[in-house]
């Protein structure tokens, strides 16, 4: 049906066909270069490339080290973020350390890749470092590769997540500083604070885990701090300065300073310790407070020792002794007045041993937001001390239950109990010593209260009878002149 063909594919015929085709292509190329403009040739070439090259489903974003003349914030955030994503599959790392750092800085070397997952979507990071032809400039950048369908999620949500995580990592690595106007600036000073503030590293070991406080009270403080950190937009919406005021009150040795250190270590906030006695007047107070930094805790200890805060009427006196001093109105102006809006993310802490001595204006809501009673140690607080100092669970030792009952019924401070727990290395000896100490303290407290009660009752009776009080002190000059018996009465003092 199909006649056979005499045509055969011999090597000579194939070579002849190849030569003819090659000659035609060379002639076509020559004509193309001679008669078709270069721009038109490039246009058709790009069309052919796009038509025949398969489209990739991946998109790559370049994150350069510099953005214009400034550092690229996204590059720095990615560098910090990827340090926490280094896994065992990474083959090459870079390690460095500067004198002020406590830990080594570890990052990936060029050519290394890191896979990351965000909301069930996978992305790939690559670190690239290249030099120019002269070798005097190094270009560093990250390549972020992901599927094109994830473009909006990565460029909006994921990169925002990377920046936020990097800020959190930096806060955790940051060394908390303690500022005071009595300390000279050191090499560790970052220069952020002015106003003659000097600083040292706050290496106080106190944390909320080591505080001898009721667990529920500690949880309330932590929850309040967390809410404060997350409410930037809330404070802005309600028209309030982004700050929080705490009043710590209670007898000495109950852990007020330790709580402040625990708050600073938890928040990674610097601490500015201000002594009002070192401030000349309200103008200097304003300058000093304006020189503090954001994300800091301003501490004014023993606020009850300042006469102007105890007695508001002292502001209205005109004598020279009062002039040139810090007044209560000057302090209140920085708590909730016009000057309270300076800075963001600030915490103000006042401490006092005698809350009742403070002017009521200082205690009103909106000025001191949280009042924390740092009272005597409780049984639960003693458990924390036993765990910290003896390294054991108080519930596992037979003497601890007896001590907890004694502590709950006695006025004894955590500092006093901590001192007793360091008296010996033997646990049984220490705990028996604590029992003896608490029992002795209980007897002393009971005796003191009884004496005060008797003295007060006696004084009340004698006052009603018009006679002397508990302790009598005669006026100088011996006998008093005059006929009346009431003249020259001794002054009465209560112990």
Swiss-Prot record:
Q: How does the entry describe its membrane topology?
A: Single-pass membrane protein
Which CDD domains does the record associate with it?
Answer: RecA-like_BCS1
Cellular component terms (Gene Ontology): endoplasmic reticulum; membrane
Molecular function GO labels: ATP binding; ATP hydrolysis activity
Q: In the Enzyme Commission scheme, what number(s) does this protein have?
A: 3.6.1.-
Q: In its UniProt entry, what is this protein called? A: AAA-ATPase At2g18193
Cofactor(s), by name: Mg(2+)
What is this enzyme's catalytic activity, as reactions? ATP + H2O = ADP + phosphate + H(+)
């Amino acid at each position: 049906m199909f006649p056979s063909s005499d045509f055969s594919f011999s090597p000579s015929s194939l070579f002849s066909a190849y030569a003819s085709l090659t000659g035609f292509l060379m002639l076509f190329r020559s004509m193309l270069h001679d008669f078709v403009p270069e721009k038109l040739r490039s246009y058709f070439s790009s069309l052919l490339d796009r038509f025949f090259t398969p489209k990739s489903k991946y998109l790559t974003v370049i994150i350069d080290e510099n953005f214009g003349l400034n550092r690229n914030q996204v590059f720095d955030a990615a560098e910090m973020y990827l340090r926490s994503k280094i896994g065992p599959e990474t083959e090459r790392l870079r390690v460095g350390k500067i004198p002020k750092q406590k830990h080594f800085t570890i990052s990936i070397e060029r050519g290394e890749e890191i896979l990351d997952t965000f909301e069930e979507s996978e992305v790939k990071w690559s670190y690239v470092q290249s030099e120019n032809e002269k070798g005097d400039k190094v270009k560093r950048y990250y390549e972020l590769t992901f599927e094109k369908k994830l473009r909006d999620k990565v460029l909006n949500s994921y990169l925002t997540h990377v920046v936020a995580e990097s800020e959190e990592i930096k806060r955790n690595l940051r060394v908390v500083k303690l500022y005071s106007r009595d300390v000279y600036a050191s090499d560790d000073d970052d220069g952020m604070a002015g106003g003659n503030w000097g600083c040292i590293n706050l290496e106080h070991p106190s944390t909320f885990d080591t505080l001898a406080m009721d667990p529920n009270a500690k949880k309330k403080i932590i929850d309040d701090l967390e809410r404060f950190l997350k409410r930037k937009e809330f404070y802005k919406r309600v028209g309030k300065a982004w700050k929080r005021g705490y009043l710590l009150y209670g007898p000495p040795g109950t852990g007020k300073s330790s709580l402040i250190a625990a708050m600073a270590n938890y928040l990674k906030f610097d601490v500015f310790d201000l002594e009002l006695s070192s401030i000349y007047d309200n103008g200097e107070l304003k300058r000093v407070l304006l020189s503090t930094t954001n994300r800091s805790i301003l501490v004014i200890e023993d606020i009850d020792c300042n006469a102007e805060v105890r007695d508001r009427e002292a502001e209205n006196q005109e004598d020279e002794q009062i002039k040139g001093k810090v007044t209560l109105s000057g302090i209140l102006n920085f708590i909730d007045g016009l000057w309270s809006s300076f800075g963001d993310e600030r915490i103000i802490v006042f401490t006092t041993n005698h809350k009742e001595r403070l002017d009521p204006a200082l205690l009103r809501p909106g000025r001191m937001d949280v009042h924390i009673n740092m009272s005597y140690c409780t049984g639960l607080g003693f458990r924390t001390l036993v765990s910290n100092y003896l390294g054991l669970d108080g519930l596992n030792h037979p003497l601890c239950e007896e001590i907890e009952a004694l502590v709950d019924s006695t006025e004894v401070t955590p500092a006093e109990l901590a001192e007793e727990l360091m008296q010996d290395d033997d646990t049984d000896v220490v705990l028996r010593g604590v029992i003896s100490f608490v029992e002795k303290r209980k007897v002393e407290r009971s005796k003191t209260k009884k004496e005060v009660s008797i003295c007060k009752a006696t004084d009340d009776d004698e006052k009603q009878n018009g006679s002397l009080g508990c302790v009598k002190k005669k006026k100088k000059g011996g006998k008093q002149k005059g006929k009346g018996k009431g003249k020259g009465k001794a002054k009465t003092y209560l112990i």
